[in-house]
Amino acid sequence: MAQKQNVGASAFPYATHLNVLFQQLQEIDVPALASKVEDRWYNQTLCKVNESVVRLGVMQGEYHWHKHEDDDEFFFCLDGNFIVDLEDRSVILGPLHGFTVPRGVVHRTRAPERCVILMIENAGIVPTGD
């Protein structure tokens, strides 16, 4: 297992956009949005659903080790392969596979090649972890 780092997101080249792009009753064309992304690690809030948000991730590379003390985090792979590393194992998600990381669990995510995912999490979650 790779060594864990406890570093803030400012040290990483992540493009994280917390503004909500779509309101209720608006169609969301995820493939069109993903096709325009040029960043290697992109995270955009698409919409709000009750007290949660749906975020689009277009990623290649790896995120730092982190945890969310108060919130679960759900990942759903749309295209490519997305890996969720836990302290004791790694979970590889292919297209149309999902996985929930419970609150308080140390994890990191990575994608050896470009992948497209959706994330569902509490609207108040700190994307970089606690």
Regions found by a protein language model. Give the residues of each.
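Short acidic-glycine-tyrosine-enriched beta hairpin
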Residues: 87-103
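Short strand-coil-strand connectors
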Residues: 50, 85-89, 112
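Short, conserved beta-strand element in jelly-roll/cupin
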Residues: 58-59, 68-85, 120
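A cytosolic small-molecule/anion-sensing beta-strand core signal
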Residues: 50, 78-79, 94-95, 113
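A short, N-terminal "cap"/entry segment at the start of jelly-roll beta-barrel domains
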Residues: 1-55
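Conserved short histidine dyad/triad with adjacent acidic residue
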Residues: 39-40, 53-69
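Ligand-binding loop in jelly-roll beta-barrel domains
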Residues: 103-130
